Amino acid sequence: MVEHYPVLHREVLSFFKNIKGRYIVDATVGGGGHSFLLLKNLPETFLIGIDKDDYALEKAEEKLSPFKGRFRLIKGSFKDIDTIVHSMDIKYVSGVLFDLGVSTFQLKTERGFSFQREEPLDMRMDRTQKKTAFDVVNRYTKIELEKIIKDYGEEKFARRIASAIVEARKKKRIETTKELAQIVYNVYPPPLRRGRIHPATKTFQAIRIEVNNELEEIKEGVNKGIDLLEKGGIIAVISFHSLEDRIVKNIYRERKRLKDIEILTKKPITPGTEEIRENPPSRSAKLRVAKRI
């Protein structure tokens, strides 16, 4: 079986390898891919892993078992990163990592993140929260749907897609990923249906962001992550679409103006050809890194 490394793993390690302090926070621990490599390569490190997703935490616990006693996994949102770290009687940390992508295993969990299979419209990272993709698709007004698809998906056919969703749900509730993907597919002009990226990709992204309140949480989490860093500490954020990247870029720019950080990546680092070939979903990843001063 081929071992799949987490996205931009070499680049992430290169920034964290000279960290002097003890504590690193993986604010989006997922299945534990980045955490595993950090623990393996930084033997003095104690890692705090945060995730909303119970299933992710189970996978991470299993993955990180060789490093028993050197990590702690906590269920929570990275917007509460400060509260979580302080609850462990830790004031400052040496490194913070955010990987904002949806984990590969989440795409395979039959929770509606993917339109490759017939799945219920769910998309919740935290299974205990009430709002699901089903609620967004079946209860939001046409204007609300158009706004989120346009703003969060940067989808040029947002108005047509919103109208098609509202028309379709008049006949019956839209219950599965395949149903929603087909509605979006049918809206697209035929010449644009055959591209490398499925027509429904941006709409699914938009609905997932809405369900999980992702953009607000990124703003809050990244700012708090910077505040937690000791002098010389490193923050690294991997984003997967322009909305996320813009938020991170603007936060870094503002915190640099306030003389809180030095930006270490003048332009975001992106995967090389080899990594994209081995792991196609990594193609849109962008890594931005800064150091606390």
Curated annotation (Swiss-Prot):
**Which keywords belong to this entry?**
Cytoplasm, Methyltransferase, rRNA processing, S-adenosyl-L-methionine, Transferase
Annotated binding of S-adenosyl-L-methionine, by residue:
32-34, 51, 78, 99, 106
Q: Which organism is it from?
A: Persephonella marina (strain DSM 14350 / EX-H1)
Could you tell me one molecular function GO term of this UniProt entry? rRNA (cytosine-N4-)-methyltransferase activity
Q: Which GO terms describe its biological process?
A: rRNA base methylation
InterPro entries associated with the record = RsmH, SAM-dep_MeTrfase_MraW_recog, SAM-dependent_MTases_sf
Which family, according to the similarity comment? Answer: Belongs to the methyltransferase superfamily. RsmH family.
Catalytic activity, reaction form: cytidine(1402) in 16S rRNA + S-adenosyl-L-methionine = N(4)-methylcytidine(1402) in 16S rRNA + S-adenosyl-L-homocysteine + H(+)
Q: According to its UniProt record, where is this protein located?
A: Cytoplasm
**Which Pfam families would you find in this protein's record?**
Methyltransf_5
Listed under GO cellular component are: cytoplasm
What EC designation does it have? Answer: 2.1.1.199
Function, in words: Specifically methylates the N4 position of cytidine in position 1402 (C1402) of 16S rRNA.
What is this protein called in UniProt?
A: Ribosomal RNA small subunit methyltransferase H
**Does the keyword section mention Iron-sulfur?**
no
